[in-house]
Amino acid sequence: MLVIKADYKKYPLPVLESMRINEDEFYGKYDACIIVQTCNRIEAYFDEEINDIEKIIPDFKGFDVIKGKKATLHFLNVACGMDSMILGENQILGQIKSSYHKSKELKKTSKYLENLFLKAIHVGQRVRAETKINEGGVSIGSAAVELAEMKLGLKNRNVLLIGAGEIGTLVAKALIEKHIKAVIVANRTYERAETLAKELKGMAVHFDKLKEAINFSDVIICATSSPHYILEKSDLLDVGNKIIIDIANPRDVDDSVRELENISLYTIDDLRNISDKNLQKRLKEVPIVENIIEEEYGILLKQIEKTNVEEVIKDFNTYIEDVRKKELEKAVRLCKNKSPDEIMENFSKAFVKRITHDFVSYSLSVSKEDLLNSIWWKK
């Protein structure tokens, strides 16, 4: 088991984006591998050592390489959201499933990788079912959505998201899980608004249509990187009752908006309390998750051992059958004028001699440790 990886803990997101693997080239080169790529991580999983990967990945020196038990435990932690930027987040599990299915469709999985990925998916599902590691928003974006849910309820509500950058994307991820009537995305660069709106199954609007979008919406979440105010008191005098959540830094909404009775304004300071409390709740679940991972890792090892034994038995039977056919053909050819008893006598001796010779030859060519750990008849 070998993993190459680069993630948000080592590189900023723009650098990670530049390091992305060309999946078509990668899958074309290797027979057994699975690639997991998200906005926060780039990882490739192999069931054996590889020597020429730098030919496929120009920035290979920037990747970390982990092997064996450490690599397997790393992947189980990834599937559980323990290695995510947002502790316990759900999205990574879906991304792992998609990566597995793509590799399987391309016939690039192996028995070991299938066991590993199916186990990781199972563990990720179990952890989220048996613990609270994914409950409560811990990012500012998800906390904003949680606050809107607490104050108004989001089911069948219209939400306007102003800003389609990094923070806006975090809000979008949190909104996906809610049963919202309509989501509108506004951004100065319309193409970015359009891309994010498609992900949300919502609609994008140009910035010059912002007033109409505000009138239509129940909740407005502001998350731009603008150096000046996007909304001022004069913009909101006649728009009806609204909840506005400003998570931009610097602020998108002039604080004088609080003077309007029809507007409830919340800022990033209001959200930090929610985010911090939820993070503490999730952190309390970490030891439980770690115990589940350790337990499931033990089960995985037994599954792999069973699979290995089954493969050994299959290979041994194939080897024996191959020897039997060859020695029987030789015995019949050399003993044409002999009785069946003589043919069987010669065949049985040759059969045993061939198997014994192969085993002894291999035994003398390797160390005692290698002999005990290897499958001699596959050599």
Swiss-Prot record:
Q: What is its EC number?
A: 1.2.1.70
List the PROSITE patterns hit by this protein, alphabetically: GLUTR
Query: Can you tell me which residues form the catalytic site?
Result: 39 (nucleophile)
For binding NADP(+), which residues are annotated in this chain's numbering?
Answer: 163-168
State the InterPro entries in the record.
Answer: 4pyrrol_synth_GluRdtase, 4pyrrol_synth_GluRdtase_dimer, 4pyrrol_synth_GluRdtase_N, GluRdtase_CS, GluRdtase_dimer_dom_sf, GluRdtase_N_sf, NAD(P)-bd_dom_sf, Shikm_DH/Glu-tRNA_Rdtase
Protein's pathway: Porphyrin-containing compound metabolism; protoporphyrin-IX biosynthesis; 5-aminolevulinate from L-glutamyl-tRNA(Glu): step 1/2
Q: Indicate the annotated site residue(s) for Important for activity.
A: 74
Pfam families (alphabetical): GlutR_dimer, GlutR_N, Shikimate_DH
According to its UniProt record, which protein family does this protein belong to?
Belongs to the glutamyl-tRNA reductase family.
What further note is attached to this protein's record? During catalysis, the active site Cys acts as a nucleophile attacking the alpha-carbonyl group of tRNA-bound glutamate with the formation of a thioester intermediate between enzyme and glutamate, and the concomitant release of tRNA(Glu). The thioester intermediate is finally reduced by direct hydride transfer from NADPH, to form the product GSA.
Question: What is the protein named?
Answer: Glutamyl-tRNA reductase
Naturally occurring in which organism (per UniProt): Methanococcus vannielii (strain ATCC 35089 / DSM 1224 / JCM 13029 / OCM 148 / SB)
Q: Output the lineage of the source organism.
A: Archaea, Methanobacteriati, Methanobacteriota, Methanomada group, Methanococci
